[in-house]
Amino acid sequence: MASEVAVIAGAGAGLSASLARLLTKEGFRVVLAARNTAKLASLVEETGALAVETDVADPASVASLFEAADKQGPLALAVFNASGRTRGPIAEVDPDAVKQALLVGAYGGFLVGQQAARRLLARGSGSILFTGASASIKGFPGSAGFAMPKFGLRGLAQSMARELFPKNIHVAHFIIDGQIEPVGKKPERPDSQLSPDAIAQTYLATHRQHRSAWSFEVELRPWVETF
Protein backbone atom coordinates (compact mmCIF):
# COMPACT_ATOMS: atom_id res chain seq x y z
CA MET A 1 0.00 0.00 0.00
CA ALA A 2 1.33 3.46 -0.91
CA SER A 3 2.19 5.82 1.93
CA GLU A 4 -0.25 8.64 2.60
CA VAL A 5 0.85 11.98 1.21
CA ALA A 6 1.14 15.31 3.02
CA VAL A 7 1.54 18.51 1.00
CA ILE A 8 3.11 21.52 2.71
CA ALA A 9 2.64 24.74 0.73
CA GLY A 10 4.93 27.62 1.58
CA ALA A 11 7.79 25.39 2.72
CA GLY A 12 10.95 26.75 4.26
CA ALA A 13 12.81 26.73 7.55
CA GLY A 14 10.99 26.77 10.88
CA LEU A 15 7.49 25.32 11.08
CA SER A 16 7.44 23.77 7.60
CA ALA A 17 10.74 22.02 8.23
CA SER A 18 9.54 20.73 11.60
CA LEU A 19 6.36 19.44 9.97
CA ALA A 20 8.33 17.74 7.20
CA ARG A 21 10.55 15.94 9.70
CA LEU A 22 7.68 14.88 11.94
CA LEU A 23 5.40 13.72 9.14
CA THR A 24 8.21 11.76 7.51
CA LYS A 25 8.95 10.08 10.84
CA GLU A 26 5.24 9.22 11.11
CA GLY A 27 5.25 7.50 7.73
CA PHE A 28 3.90 10.20 5.40
CA ARG A 29 5.32 10.88 1.96
CA VAL A 30 5.95 14.61 2.16
CA VAL A 31 5.68 17.03 -0.76
CA LEU A 32 7.14 20.50 -0.20
CA ALA A 33 6.01 23.48 -2.28
CA ALA A 34 8.10 26.64 -2.49
CA ARG A 35 8.96 29.33 -5.01
CA ASN A 36 12.65 28.55 -4.48
CA THR A 37 13.25 24.83 -3.98
CA ALA A 38 17.03 25.27 -3.83
CA LYS A 39 16.68 26.46 -0.24
CA LEU A 40 15.04 23.13 0.62
CA ALA A 41 17.97 20.98 -0.55
CA SER A 42 19.20 20.00 2.91
CA LEU A 43 15.66 19.31 4.16
CA VAL A 44 14.94 17.15 1.11
CA GLU A 45 18.15 15.21 1.69
CA GLU A 46 17.27 14.74 5.36
CA THR A 47 13.65 13.68 4.91
CA GLY A 48 13.43 12.27 1.40
CA ALA A 49 10.63 14.72 0.65
CA LEU A 50 9.74 15.79 -2.86
CA ALA A 51 10.26 19.51 -3.49
CA VAL A 52 8.12 21.15 -6.19
CA GLU A 53 8.71 24.70 -7.39
CA THR A 54 5.35 26.38 -6.90
CA ASP A 55 3.79 29.81 -7.10
CA VAL A 56 0.81 29.44 -4.77
CA ALA A 57 -0.85 32.46 -6.38
CA ASP A 58 -0.90 30.80 -9.81
CA PRO A 59 -3.70 28.28 -10.51
CA ALA A 60 -1.69 26.27 -13.05
CA SER A 61 1.31 26.07 -10.75
CA VAL A 62 -0.79 24.83 -7.83
CA ALA A 63 -2.53 22.30 -10.06
CA SER A 64 0.88 20.99 -11.16
CA LEU A 65 1.93 20.71 -7.51
CA PHE A 66 -0.98 18.44 -6.69
CA GLU A 67 -0.53 16.42 -9.86
CA ALA A 68 3.04 15.75 -8.72
CA ALA A 69 1.72 14.80 -5.28
CA ASP A 70 -0.77 12.39 -6.86
CA LYS A 71 2.15 10.35 -8.19
CA GLN A 72 3.45 9.86 -4.63
CA GLY A 73 0.29 8.28 -3.25
CA PRO A 74 -3.14 9.23 -1.86
CA LEU A 75 -3.40 12.70 -0.34
CA ALA A 76 -4.28 12.67 3.36
CA LEU A 77 -3.15 16.08 4.59
CA ALA A 78 -2.56 19.54 3.11
CA VAL A 79 -0.99 22.36 5.11
CA PHE A 80 -1.07 25.94 3.83
CA ASN A 81 1.84 27.72 5.46
CA ALA A 82 2.52 30.42 2.88
CA SER A 83 2.24 34.00 4.06
CA GLY A 84 2.06 37.25 2.18
CA ARG A 85 2.84 40.36 4.16
CA THR A 86 3.90 43.94 3.84
CA ARG A 87 3.98 46.58 6.54
CA GLY A 88 3.86 50.35 6.60
CA PRO A 89 1.63 53.34 7.37
CA ILE A 90 -1.66 53.18 5.47
CA ALA A 91 -0.91 56.45 3.64
CA GLU A 92 2.47 55.19 2.46
CA VAL A 93 2.33 51.43 1.99
CA ASP A 94 2.93 50.23 -1.58
CA PRO A 95 -0.38 49.15 -3.19
CA ASP A 96 1.38 46.58 -5.39
CA ALA A 97 3.01 45.01 -2.34
CA VAL A 98 -0.40 44.77 -0.62
CA LYS A 99 -1.89 43.17 -3.74
CA GLN A 100 0.90 40.59 -3.82
CA ALA A 101 0.42 39.84 -0.12
CA LEU A 102 -3.27 39.17 -0.76
CA LEU A 103 -2.51 36.97 -3.75
CA VAL A 104 -0.07 34.81 -1.79
CA GLY A 105 -1.69 34.80 1.63
CA ALA A 106 -5.40 34.57 0.77
CA TYR A 107 -5.85 33.65 -2.90
CA GLY A 108 -3.03 31.13 -2.57
CA GLY A 109 -4.85 29.54 0.34
CA PHE A 110 -7.96 29.23 -1.81
CA LEU A 111 -6.06 27.58 -4.67
CA VAL A 112 -4.30 25.09 -2.40
CA GLY A 113 -7.50 24.42 -0.45
CA GLN A 114 -9.47 23.83 -3.64
CA GLN A 115 -7.00 21.34 -5.08
CA ALA A 116 -6.76 19.52 -1.75
CA ALA A 117 -10.55 19.44 -1.31
CA ARG A 118 -11.08 17.86 -4.72
CA ARG A 119 -8.82 14.96 -3.81
CA LEU A 120 -10.01 14.50 -0.25
CA LEU A 121 -13.67 14.57 -1.29
CA ALA A 122 -12.95 11.80 -3.79
CA ARG A 123 -11.21 9.83 -1.06
CA GLY A 124 -13.80 10.59 1.62
CA SER A 125 -11.41 11.71 4.35
CA GLY A 126 -8.40 13.87 5.17
CA SER A 127 -7.41 17.23 6.61
CA ILE A 128 -6.67 20.73 5.34
CA LEU A 129 -4.83 22.95 7.82
CA PHE A 130 -4.25 26.70 7.49
CA THR A 131 -1.62 28.70 9.37
CA GLY A 132 -2.89 32.03 10.65
CA ALA A 133 -1.62 34.59 13.14
CA SER A 134 -2.85 37.03 15.75
CA ALA A 135 -3.37 39.33 12.75
CA SER A 136 -6.08 36.90 11.60
CA ILE A 137 -8.40 38.32 14.23
CA LYS A 138 -6.87 41.70 15.12
CA GLY A 139 -5.57 44.42 12.83
CA PHE A 140 -2.56 46.28 14.22
CA PRO A 141 -1.34 49.78 13.26
CA GLY A 142 0.84 49.73 10.17
CA SER A 143 -0.10 46.12 9.40
CA ALA A 144 -3.02 46.40 6.97
CA GLY A 145 -0.98 44.52 4.39
CA PHE A 146 -0.60 41.60 6.78
CA ALA A 147 -4.03 41.63 8.42
CA MET A 148 -5.91 41.68 5.11
CA PRO A 149 -4.59 38.34 3.79
CA LYS A 150 -4.80 36.75 7.24
CA PHE A 151 -8.43 37.83 7.75
CA GLY A 152 -9.19 36.51 4.26
CA LEU A 153 -7.51 33.18 4.94
CA ARG A 154 -9.49 32.75 8.14
CA GLY A 155 -12.75 33.45 6.30
CA LEU A 156 -11.79 30.88 3.69
CA ALA A 157 -11.06 28.31 6.39
CA GLN A 158 -14.41 28.97 8.10
CA SER A 159 -16.33 28.57 4.85
CA MET A 160 -14.47 25.40 3.94
CA ALA A 161 -14.93 23.90 7.39
CA ARG A 162 -18.69 24.44 7.37
CA GLU A 163 -18.92 22.94 3.89
CA LEU A 164 -16.53 20.02 4.33
CA PHE A 165 -16.98 18.87 7.94
CA PRO A 166 -20.23 17.06 7.02
CA LYS A 167 -18.31 15.30 4.24
CA ASN A 168 -15.69 13.93 6.64
CA ILE A 169 -13.00 16.45 5.65
CA HIS A 170 -11.35 18.13 8.63
CA VAL A 171 -10.49 21.80 8.07
CA ALA A 172 -8.67 23.67 10.82
CA HIS A 173 -7.22 27.16 11.25
CA PHE A 174 -4.32 27.88 13.60
CA ILE A 175 -3.72 31.26 15.20
CA ILE A 176 -0.01 31.48 15.91
CA ASP A 177 0.09 34.24 18.52
CA GLY A 178 3.75 35.08 18.82
CA GLN A 179 7.05 34.70 17.05
CA ILE A 180 8.24 31.25 16.02
CA GLU A 181 11.79 30.49 17.11
CA PRO A 182 14.11 31.38 14.22
CA VAL A 183 16.51 28.65 13.17
CA GLY A 184 19.85 28.88 14.96
CA LYS A 185 18.92 31.81 17.23
CA LYS A 186 18.21 31.73 20.94
CA PRO A 187 15.37 33.98 22.15
CA GLU A 188 16.38 36.93 24.31
CA ARG A 189 13.74 35.95 26.85
CA PRO A 190 13.38 32.25 27.71
CA ASP A 191 10.07 30.75 26.55
CA SER A 192 9.11 33.96 24.71
CA GLN A 193 8.87 32.25 21.31
CA LEU A 194 6.98 29.25 19.98
CA SER A 195 8.88 26.05 19.28
CA PRO A 196 8.28 24.98 15.66
CA ASP A 197 8.56 21.35 16.74
CA ALA A 198 5.82 21.86 19.34
CA ILE A 199 3.57 23.55 16.78
CA ALA A 200 4.14 20.67 14.37
CA GLN A 201 3.08 18.18 17.05
CA THR A 202 -0.16 20.12 17.51
CA TYR A 203 -0.84 20.11 13.77
CA LEU A 204 -0.37 16.34 13.61
CA ALA A 205 -2.55 15.81 16.68
CA THR A 206 -5.28 17.94 15.08
CA HIS A 207 -5.10 15.89 11.89
CA ARG A 208 -5.49 12.73 13.96
CA GLN A 209 -8.42 13.93 16.08
CA HIS A 210 -11.40 11.62 16.27
CA ARG A 211 -14.19 13.05 14.14
CA SER A 212 -16.56 13.11 17.11
CA ALA A 213 -14.45 15.94 18.56
CA TRP A 214 -12.83 17.93 15.77
CA SER A 215 -11.25 21.32 16.44
CA PHE A 216 -11.73 24.12 13.95
CA GLU A 217 -9.70 26.97 15.42
CA VAL A 218 -6.63 26.37 17.56
CA GLU A 219 -4.77 29.24 19.26
CA LEU A 220 -1.12 28.65 20.10
CA ARG A 221 1.05 31.03 22.11
CA PRO A 222 3.92 30.89 24.62
CA TRP A 223 2.77 30.64 28.21
CA VAL A 224 4.37 34.04 28.93
CA GLU A 225 2.50 35.79 26.09
CA THR A 226 -0.03 38.46 27.11
CA PHE A 227 -3.38 38.14 25.37
Annotate each language-model stretch with its function.
Residues E26-S42:
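Conserved glycine-rich Rossmann-like NAD(P)H-binding loop of the short-chain dehydrogenase/reductase
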Residues P166-P182, K186-F227:
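C-terminal helical subdomain
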